[in-house]
């Protein structure tokens, strides 16, 4: 729990700063795409991630490598931000910072990020209907639905929005029924 609180105290200020810069420069999407590309690259190349996170390697050397590799791909604002993360020994949080930045952008656009775990893929019509219900319930202009197929739910789905979980799955109903039986 303490580690989680410490991480959020680190992640939020950096993601807020990046959001503020992106807003001033009107580069929400460019920076979002850059951060996602960088995060994907570091996740897929484990050696590169270890290189960046190793405190024994000189920070200037890390920054030089990042700039050499990404200078033609990433926006200069994004590169400078990543350099700051390296300088402040915060590069290990880049994935979390990127995720929080994306949430701030969506919030600014009055878009709610909704993760949906379902037993099978919903049809386009079902997804649209669910989207309309969620927009009305959470009073927002738009919702961004991210689906994750989880066959163990049997039927129905779970909705994760902000800190809320709405479980309308058969698995959830069975667990609740089991709880009543064992009570």
From Swiss-Prot:
| Membrane-related topology note | Peripheral membrane protein
GO CC annotations, alphabetized = chloroplast thylakoid membrane; proton-transporting ATP synthase complex
Name one matching Pfam family. OSCP
InterPro entries membership: ATP_synth_OSCP/delta_N_sf, ATPase_OSCP/dsu
Q: What is its main location?
A: plastid
Cell compartments where the protein resides = Plastid, Chloroplast thylakoid membrane
Q: What keywords does the record list, in alphabetical order? A: ATP synthesis, CF(1), Chloroplast, Hydrogen ion transport, Ion transport, Membrane, Plastid, Thylakoid, Transport
Q: Name one GO molecular function term.
A: proton-transporting ATP synthase activity, rotational mechanism
Q: How does it assemble?
A: F-type ATPases have 2 components, F(1) - the catalytic core - and F(0) - the membrane proton channel. F(1) has five subunits: alpha(3), beta(3), gamma(1), delta(1), epsilon(1). CF(0) has four main subunits: a(1), b(1), b'(1) and c(10-14). The alpha and beta chains form an alternating ring which encloses part of the gamma chain. F(1) is attached to F(0) by a central stalk formed by the gamma and epsilon chains, while a peripheral stalk is formed by the delta, b and b' chains.
Among PANTHER family, the record links this protein to:
ATP SYNTHASE DELTA CHAIN
Q: What does this protein do?
A: F(1)F(0) ATP synthase produces ATP from ADP in the presence of a proton or sodium gradient. F-type ATPases consist of two structural domains, F(1) containing the extramembraneous catalytic core and F(0) containing the membrane proton channel, linked together by a central stalk and a peripheral stalk. During catalysis, ATP synthesis in the catalytic domain of F(1) is coupled via a rotary mechanism of the central stalk subunits to proton translocation. This protein is part of the stalk that links CF(0) to CF(1). It either transmits conformational changes from CF(0) to CF(1) or is implicated in proton conduction.
What protein family is recorded? Belongs to the ATPase delta chain family.
**Record-linked HAMAP family:** ATP_synth_delta_bact
- The name under which this protein is listed is ATP synthase subunit delta, chloroplastic
Q: State the species of origin.
A: Cyanidium caldarium (Red alga)
Upper lineage is: Eukaryota, Rhodophyta, Bangiophyceae, Cyanidiales, Cyanidiaceae
Whichever gene encodes this chain, its name is: atpD
